[in-house]
Amino acid sequence: MKGKGRNRAVKSLEIYVRKLAQANGIKPEMAAHIFHLIYEETPNGGISDDDLESLTGYKQSDIRRILRLLGDKRIIVSRKGRHPRKEATRYFWRIDSDTINVSLLTLKKKVLEKLVVKEAHDSGNSYYTCPRCGSKYSFDEAFTLDFTCPRCGEVLEEADSREGLERLRRTIDALREEIARDESRIYRS
């Protein structure tokens, strides 16, 4: 990852880390902070959980929980090392560009899969919107509501979803191309 691509990838990863943390009952800002410290120390061989604790003031149990989560998702990797003054083994955490690229590719494929499902669903269904408040309902929902908005009482109108579907299809095509480029870069022989 170089230049603008690196910055975009780091921002995407930070968003992903925050969502992962939140889904696992961890404070998103804490996980993002740990991620950024690891990212900054990766060129220096990584950072230990002891160093993360002294730099952040976070409890070691919280730090290790975040490290385990990021490690399980292959965002970070560890290596064993010796503590300079103790006989204890330390683990140094760093971002490995190979595993992170594969993780990002996997994430993109999951997003693509969801978009394809949405496109299939949206192309096979009609929607109704409220011209006053903008609420959107499927045909079945609108039928149940007698084509009247439950929020404001306005008559629902059939939505023209062609433009939205076209935009969704362009997004799907662009993501497929990006995935193909990433796969050729990651798996080239």
Curated annotation (Swiss-Prot):
Keyword Hydrolase: no
GO molecular function: DNA binding
Origin: domain of life: Archaea
Record keywords: DNA-binding, Transcription, Transcription regulation
Chain ranges of the HTH TFE/IIEalpha-type domain: 9-101
Keyword Cell inner membrane included in the entry's annotation: no
Biological processes annotated in GO: regulation of DNA-templated transcription; transcription initiation at RNA polymerase II promoter
SMART domains: TFIIE
Quaternary organization: Monomer. Interaction with RNA polymerase subunits RpoF and RpoE is necessary for Tfe stimulatory transcription activity. Able to interact with Tbp and RNA polymerase in the absence of DNA promoter. Interacts both with the preinitiation and elongation complexes.
The protein's role, per its UniProt record: Transcription factor that plays a role in the activation of archaeal genes transcribed by RNA polymerase. Facilitates transcription initiation by enhancing TATA-box recognition by TATA-box-binding protein (Tbp), and transcription factor B (Tfb) and RNA polymerase recruitment. Not absolutely required for transcription in vitro, but particularly important in cases where Tbp or Tfb function is not optimal. It dynamically alters the nucleic acid-binding properties of RNA polymerases by stabilizing the initiation complex and destabilizing elongation complexes.
Domain commentary: The winged helix domain is involved in binding to DNA in the preinitiation complex.
Family under the similarity heading: Belongs to the TFE family.
Stated name of the protein: Transcription factor E
Natural source organism: Aeropyrum pernix (strain ATCC 700893 / DSM 11879 / JCM 9820 / NBRC 100138 / K1)
